[in-house]
């Protein structure tokens, strides 16, 4: 299925009775082929989704709530279109379940089927909400740099590295990532952290490159994979990890992580804008 066929950007009828058919899968393949990624992926990782508007009824009719977190493997053939995900989760609102575990298991089954891979699901109960604290990305902020730029479409030629000097290891981040939904044109605001081992990457060029996504249209996952591929090709790091966290839309935030080495999955931190 294509994004144009999805509910995104269209008037929708909201149902409050559970309906798994609302989930709309989109194949990763086409967007990956457009940036030179074939069947052999140059990375592994996960897409972390947080859902803040999940509610259902218990067996006695009393509303229940939870914050849901989904871990979608990067090698899944499909992603779920975000508005369809919102509509799907909304369909739980007037549906009775015996327990929170039953809700979790239902969501895991449905979303895994839509993505074509096993998706991990975690539900945080209200008494644990206090543990959902704000954090910040570790590393050196690129946003401190005072620079000029006028490039607002992705341009890998902005990336420079000291290819003939001794390798370094560093972590940098920026809060200036912005792209746009390819269907609705709505802005997607995010932060991105890059950790690498290899030739020193020019910080000004890297920040200009991140800023260059400002008028780009692409889903969150696709933007992160393009950043990964461009940095890997232009700067030739031996190890590379790219982690982006986007602000929520429709009660959902999406946080893709990609790496080419054995690195633990990142913390599902909550940045200030999330």
From Swiss-Prot:
**Gene from which the chain derives:** queF
Its primary localisation, in coarse terms, equals cytoplasm
* Binding positions for substrate per the UniProt entry: 80-82, 220-221
**Which Gene Ontology cellular component terms are annotated?**
cytoplasm
- Pfam family, any one: QueF_N
What's the protein name?
NADPH-dependent 7-cyano-7-deazaguanine reductase
Catalytic activity, reaction form: 7-aminomethyl-7-carbaguanine + 2 NADP(+) = 7-cyano-7-deazaguanine + 2 NADPH + 3 H(+)
Q: What is its EC number?
A: 1.7.1.13
Biological role: Catalyzes the NADPH-dependent reduction of 7-cyano-7-deazaguanine (preQ0) to 7-aminomethyl-7-deazaguanine (preQ1).
Source organism per UniProt: Paraburkholderia xenovorans (strain LB400)
Return the InterPro entries for the record: GTP-CH-I_C/QueF (IPR043133), NADPH_dep_7-cyano-7-deazaG_red (IPR050084), QueF (IPR029500), QueF_N (IPR029139), QueF_type2 (IPR016428)
Report the subcellular localization. Answer: Cytoplasm
Family in the record: Belongs to the GTP cyclohydrolase I family. QueF type 2 subfamily.
Answer whether the UniProt record assigns the keyword Cytoplasm to this protein.
yes
């Amino acid at each position: 299925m294509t994004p144009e066929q999805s509910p995104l950007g269209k008037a929708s009828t909201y149902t409050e009775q559970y309906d798994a058919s609302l989930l709309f899968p989109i194949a990763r393949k086409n967007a990956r082929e457009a940036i030179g990624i074939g069947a052999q992926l140059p990375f592994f990782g996960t897409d972390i989704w947080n859902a803040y508007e999940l509610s259902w009824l218990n067996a006695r009719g009393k509303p229940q709530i939870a914050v849901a977190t989904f871990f979608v493997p990067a090698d899944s053939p499909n992603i779920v279109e975000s508005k369809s995900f919102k509509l799907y989760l909304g369909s739980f609102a007037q549906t009775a379940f015996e327990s929170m575990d039953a809700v979790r298991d239902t969501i895991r089954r449905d979303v895994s089927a839509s993505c074509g891979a096993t998706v991990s699901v975690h539900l945080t109960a209200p008494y644990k909400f206090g543990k959902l604290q704000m954090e910040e990305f570790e590393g050196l902020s690129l946003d401190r740099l005072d620079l000029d730029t006028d490039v607002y479409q992705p341009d890998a030629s902005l990336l420079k590295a000291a290819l003939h000097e001794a390798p370094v290891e560093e972590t940098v981040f920026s809060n200036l990532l912005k792209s746009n939904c390819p269907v609705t044109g709505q802005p997607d605001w995010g932060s991105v952290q890059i950790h690498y081992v290899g030739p020193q990457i020019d910080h000004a060029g890297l920040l200009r490159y991140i800023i260059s996504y400002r008028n780009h249209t692409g889903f969150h996952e696709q933007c992160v994979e393009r950043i990964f591929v461009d940095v890997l090709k232009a700067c030739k790091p031996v190890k590379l990890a790219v982690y982006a966290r986007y602000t929520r839309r429709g009660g959902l935030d999406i946080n893709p992580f990609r790496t080419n080495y054995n690195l633990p999955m990142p913390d599902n931190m909550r940045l200030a804008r999330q």
